[in-house]
From Swiss-Prot, chain B:
Keywords: Heme, Iron, Metal-binding, Oxygen transport, Phosphoprotein, Transport. Heterotetramer of two alpha chains and two epsilon chains in early embryonic hemoglobin Gower-2; two zeta chains and two epsilon chains in early embryonic hemoglobin Gower-1. One of its GO terms (biological process) is hydrogen peroxide catabolic process. It comes from Cebus olivaceus (Weeper capuchin). The keyword Membrane does not apply. Residues 3-147 form the Globin domain. PANTHER family: HEMOGLOBIN FAMILY MEMBER, HEMOGLOBIN SUBUNIT EPSILON. Pfam families: Globin. GO terms for molecular function: haptoglobin binding; heme binding; hemoglobin alpha binding; metal ion binding; organic acid binding; oxygen binding; oxygen carrier activity; peroxidase activity. The gene is HBE1. The modification Phosphoserine is found at residues 14, 51. Red blood cells. Gene3D superfamilies: Globins. This is Hemoglobin subunit epsilon. Heme b binds at residues 64, 93.
Amino acid sequence: MSLTKTERTIIVSMWAKISTQADTIGTETLERLFLSYPQTKTYFPHFDLHPGSAQLRAHGSKVVAAVGDAAKSIDNIGAALSKLSELHAYILRVDPVNFKLLSHCLLVTLAARFPADFTAEAHAAWDKFLSVVSSVLTEKYR
Amino acid sequence: MVHFTAEEKVAITSLWSKMNVEEAGGEALGRLLVVYPWTQRFFDNFGNLSSPSAILGNPKVKAHGKKVLTSFGDAIKNMDNLKTTFAKLSELHCDKLHVDPENFRLLGNVMVIILATHFGKEFTPEVQAAWQKLVSAVAIALGHKYH
């Protein structure tokens, strides 16, 4: 599965808008994830997961920054996220099913914050983009 | 049996009461067909599905979307009794329509995203969680009679 030129344009132009709110988007995404899918908290026993916690904010920033890195290198996401891919495969070992859950929560956050931009076409492009990112992050699992 | 707390029920019914079910139905089904184009396999006789604007403007998509979402309204009136409420529809989707239940999960998530675009900040993480619980329970109820 690879992104068309149109899809890449949509992602890159929306990213420019999104990046100004990157940190809060990351935090909100994680809050949504942990509330809707409590089983995902099992990967964070060492975290304070209360809304507003410093750890949640820091981790949310990290996650969205990585999505941003993928958007900025949208022609070669594999290369951009290679280190992260290894981290997930050998250290974190997050079950692949969770990437869909996180992606969904990020889409919900974007839809809530940018309703006018989040057209059906943009929705499709983002869903596909995050699917590609998820594939890259799980491609070294076995 | 899924149990919804009083808060969850309020989160669900209050948003539902503000929704234009007809419009939202067309949007939900339309987005499903746009974002997950393989779902078009069930709608060969719907005419022009060749582009996002064709899909979203397609009168058959709008009509069918309205049907689907109206039925979802029944779920909301029977949140404590979903399996019974959807027993007949479950049989229909299995025996006559041959729909993979995975599609119910996809549509449920598309609906959640549409709620987010409509309600913005009001669609808080807590409200989303209540809706995820509902769409998941409806998907399970619709798959319950499969054999």
